[in-house]
């Protein structure tokens, strides 16, 4: 079991270094989120690669998890006021007064996207290391 854990850490470290070298400023920066730092593997939300995240989201590290988090791109908040939902938020004049997943719509911050997005399923060719890692994690349970 310790061998699998060490192997897991090695693979994770390789991915982390590999991903950091490919980061683009156009993707925005990872926001600080109030998300659990408990190490739980949730196949729907844990990402390993940026290409698993939808447009406007970035694969960010939170504790020992990696999630597709909403980001601003070139300081612009993505989304449309037509898609806004939720209760009226705080008063605003511009998007920069709102959180990254909100826009200033009718002088109120409104949620236009989710803070955390589900990951996209990768094609078989691009997900070999992801599948291997998930199988490895399953073995250790």
From Swiss-Prot:
GO terms for molecular function: peptidase inhibitor activity. Keywords: Disulfide bond, Secreted, Signal. InterPro entries: Elafin-like_sf, WAP_dom. It is found in: Secreted. Component of the organic matrix of calcified shell layers like nacre and prisms. Residues 1-19 form the signal peptide. GO terms for cellular component: extracellular region. The keyword Disulfide bond applies. Residues 23-71 form the WAP domain. SUPFAM superfamilies: Elafin-like. The keyword Secreted applies. Disulfide bonds join 30-60, 39-64, 47-59, 53-68, 81-105, 92-104. This is Perlwapin-like protein. The lineage of its organism: Eukaryota, Metazoa, Spiralia, Lophotrochozoa, Mollusca.
């Amino acid at each position: 079991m310790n061998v699998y854990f060490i192997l897991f850490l090695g693979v994770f470290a390789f991915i982390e270094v590999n991903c950091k070298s490919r980061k683009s400023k156009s993707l925005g920066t990872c926001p600080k989120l109030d998300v659990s730092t408990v190490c739980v593997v949730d196949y729907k939300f844990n990402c390993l690669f940026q290409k698993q995240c939808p447009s406007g989201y970035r694969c960010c590290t939170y504790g020992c998890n990696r999630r597709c988090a909403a980001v601003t791109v070139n300081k612009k908040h993505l989304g449309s006021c037509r898609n806004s939902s939720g209760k009226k938020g705080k008063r605003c004049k511009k998007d920069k007064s709102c959180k990254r997943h909100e826009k200033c719509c009718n002088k109120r911050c409104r949620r236009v996207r989710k803070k955390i997005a589900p990951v996209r399923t990768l094609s078989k060719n691009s997900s070999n290391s992801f599948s291997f890692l998930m199988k490895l994690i399953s073995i250790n349970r």
